Amino acid sequence: IRTGGCPPKDPVMETLEGETKKVLGYTCDIFTDHTLEFIQSNKDKPFLVSLHFRAPHSAWLPVRPEDWEPFKDLDPEIPNPDFPNLNVELVKKRTREYLAAVKSVDRNVGRVLDALDTLNLTDNTIVVFTSDHGYNLGEHGTWFKGNAKRILKTNPPKRWEDIPADRRPNLWDTSLRVPTAIRWP
C-alpha cells in the first residue's frame, strides 16, 4: 500500500499489483485492516510491518462516530488563550477535530495490539509507535508543524518575500518533540 496526503475517508490507493483504486471506508481503519491481514498471513514466521497512519494530519474529519463522539461538545482548554489576536474559537474547533483523529489512531493501534495478543505474538514482537514531527495546537498563535500556519483573526503584514503572511516557520518544542512509545517483550 503506497499513498500519501490522502483524505481521512475513501482514499485512492495503489495495490501491490500497481493499480490504483478508490477504497471505501475510513483511512485509518483501511490501513489497519490491511495490516491485520498481513499479520494473520505471516503469524508463523518472522515479519516486519511498517504501518503509517496519515492521521492526525489535516483534514481530520470525517472520523468514525465513536471517535468523534467524546469530542463533539468538548470545550478544550487551549495553551495560550490570551495570545494577541488569537482566533480562540477556531483553535477550539480544530482541537476537537484533531483529538478525534488521534482517537482514531489510538483505536486502530489498539486493534493491532489486540491481534498480536490474540495470535500469541506479543511475547515475540517489538512494537514501536512514533511520529514524524510534533504539532502546534495554538501555541504562539500557530497551528501545524514547523511550517505552521498562523491561527489569528487577522494576519500580520508579510515580512518575508518567500514566506506567505499566514505562515510562521518555527523550531518551537511543540513542533520538534516527537512522541515515541515502545512495547518490548
Cite the ranges covered by each PLM segment.
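Active-site-proximal cap/lid insertion segments
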Residues: 1-185
